[in-house]
């Protein structure tokens, strides 16, 4: 059985690819809930006040998601606990968290990762990272249409988004919980183009074959013309 986790910045297309990939492989998608997150709008309205609360909220939900996914062992997750510290550390670096909040956050994360390490299946089987440029990121954020994510909502978001993209390169290089691969989200518009979608799916299947984690009962005849 196979557990795949996705990563990538806001607007990269993680949720769309999660749905496409889970249907293609016949596995269960795990989506991070955003629209009913009570803290996220508060964070965008007052980032310094709510950065710690938001990250603890996400950390808790991501912990439960990865535990369930590793237990069921047949899933695709659109974001995971392995990516969590990237966001909090970035907010801490720009003064949105106190030293006490930083210490508390990392203690919580350490305890949760320790619990995962005691599970029968400890890690995912593959990380699929979607790499996008700033322009692609903003284009998809506009298309998604969440008001509090738009540049017009807050003039500081441009710097925040550009900084976030810079944090991803070292994070990906250091990630070592599983095999990993990169999808070029600028080159392949898997959300709108069926041809690009097929290329991306083929890339992921090839990687799963390489690491010996392609589901044994997978049928390549599965229709990939999925509405993302």
Curated annotation (Swiss-Prot):
Pfam families, per database record: dNK
Binding site for substrate: 32, 44, 55, 79, 84, 149
GO molecular function terms attached to this record: ATP binding; deoxyguanosine kinase activity
TM annotation in the entry: none
Keyword field contains Kinase: yes
Cellular component aspect of the GO annotation: cytoplasm
Domain of life of the source: Bacteria
Subunit annotation: Heterodimer of a deoxyadenosine (DAK) and a deoxyguanosine kinase (DGK).
Family classification: Belongs to the DCK/DGK family.
Record-given protein name: Deoxyguanosine kinase
Annotated organism of origin: Lactobacillus acidophilus (strain ATCC 700396 / NCK56 / N2 / NCFM)
